[in-house]
Amino acid sequence: MAPPNTKESQLPGEQPTALCKRCNEVQATLQIRSESVCQKCFLQYIKTKAVKRMETYKGKRSTKVPQKLLLPLSFGPSSSCLLHMLDGYLGIQHERMNRVSYELFVVHIDLYLDDADREASAARLQKYKDQYPRHSYSSYGLHEALQLEGIDWQSLGISDLPTQDTKASSFDLQKIVSSLSSATSRADIVSTLLNRLLVDVAKRNDCESILFGDTTTRLAEKTLTETAKGRGFSLPWQVSDGPSPYGIGFLYPLRDILKKEIMTFSTSFSPLPELVVHQAPPSHISASSKSTTIDDLMAQYFESVEENFPSIVANVAVEFAGFLSQRALMASMVGVEIKIQIHGHQEKTLIQILFYAMDAQDLSTDESARP
């Protein structure tokens, strides 16, 4: 006897069960953009996006010598999911071919920690080591960035630095950051020091590139944030895959995945729920608050937009980054206004491009539009 169909088996007044839009076999419980899908199809979609992006990084290099790549691990959803996905992919590679195309150097940077916090951080890092043992791991304190060479401290508004003869401490870092006048300035200096320390660690450990866990949503946030701060010239390496001015590659393997999709992944698939540290969801942020940063406002904006309009988020990150990556770099070198041509339209300046991208065709699932 044939199994009863959904309509016949449902109770009076009960809504019909929706099937997965991809396999049409299993009940849909999760979302990909605006599609309702089952867990299996969701997992396949997310993993495929990250792995396909990683495959584009290999280029023409010899596959016999694995690339060494640094993966910054914050214990948050994005970096944890990236590590989980790449660990699984490398395991399959090794099983099939007895070799891997790249090896991961996983680095955790502690921000402001006392001894007790540092012990808790080390214990959590050990959990990741136990779960994903094929990789090498290391941790550093952000205060170590205070003794890096080649940073223009004066341009950052910092003068009271520890001497080279004195070992920097987390207290020194807190003192410097708290001396800055605005919340945005404080967030900026932490972000700058974090990136410069990661670059230094990557170079000292012979890594070719850094794998950042930035999602489509995060890249869209950075695009508007850096533009608002007058730093549009930095977008080619802040949102696009490729070389950075620091002599090492910046890569974004999760660039085709929305933040809300990563959040779902991190809470739905073992062992991530036991490993990931989730930040408390932000309450409504007031633009007039002294503790509010530009980054906070952009994050709040895109968090509300991606829920119902994922194409807007994708268009900002995908279309803008793709067109900007080459021309903005050349423009910034000669100090001219950034202008580019889009779809045969008249030239548009940096800000105009952003709003054009928001109103463009839906590129959120268009593979041909990916940079």
Swiss-Prot record:
<dbReference type="GO" id="GO:0005829">
    <property type="term" value="C:cytosol"/>
</dbReference>
<protein>
    <recommendedName>
        <fullName>Cytoplasmic tRNA 2-thiolation protein 2</fullName>
    </recommendedName>
</protein>
<dbReference type="GO" id="GO:0002143">
    <property type="term" value="P:tRNA wobble position uridine thiolation"/>
</dbReference>
<dbReference type="GO" id="GO:0016779">
    <property type="term" value="F:nucleotidyltransferase activity"/>
</dbReference>
<dbReference type="GO" id="GO:0016783">
    <property type="term" value="F:sulfurtransferase activity"/>
</dbReference>
<comment type="pathway">
    <text>tRNA modification; 5-methoxycarbonylmethyl-2-thiouridine-tRNA biosynthesis.</text>
</comment>
<comment type="similarity">
    <text>Belongs to the CTU2/NCS2 family.</text>
</comment>
<keyword id="KW-0819">tRNA processing</keyword>
<dbReference type="InterPro" id="IPR019407">
    <property type="entry name" value="CTU2"/>
</dbReference>
<dbReference type="GO" id="GO:0000049">
    <property type="term" value="F:tRNA binding"/>
</dbReference>
<dbReference type="GO" id="GO:0034227">
    <property type="term" value="P:tRNA thio-modification"/>
</dbReference>
<keyword id="KW-0963">Cytoplasm</keyword>
<dbReference type="InterPro" id="IPR014729">
    <property type="entry name" value="Rossmann-like_a/b/a_fold"/>
</dbReference>
<dbReference type="GO" id="GO:0032447">
    <property type="term" value="P:protein urmylation"/>
</dbReference>
<comment type="function">
    <text>Plays a central role in 2-thiolation of mcm(5)S(2)U at tRNA wobble positions of tRNA(Lys), tRNA(Glu) and tRNA(Gln). May act by forming a heterodimer with ncs6 that ligates sulfur from thiocarboxylated urm1 onto the uridine of tRNAs at wobble position. Prior mcm(5) tRNA modification by the elongator complex is required for 2-thiolation. May also be involved in protein urmylation.</text>
</comment>
<dbReference type="GO" id="GO:0002098">
    <property type="term" value="P:tRNA wobble uridine modification"/>
</dbReference>
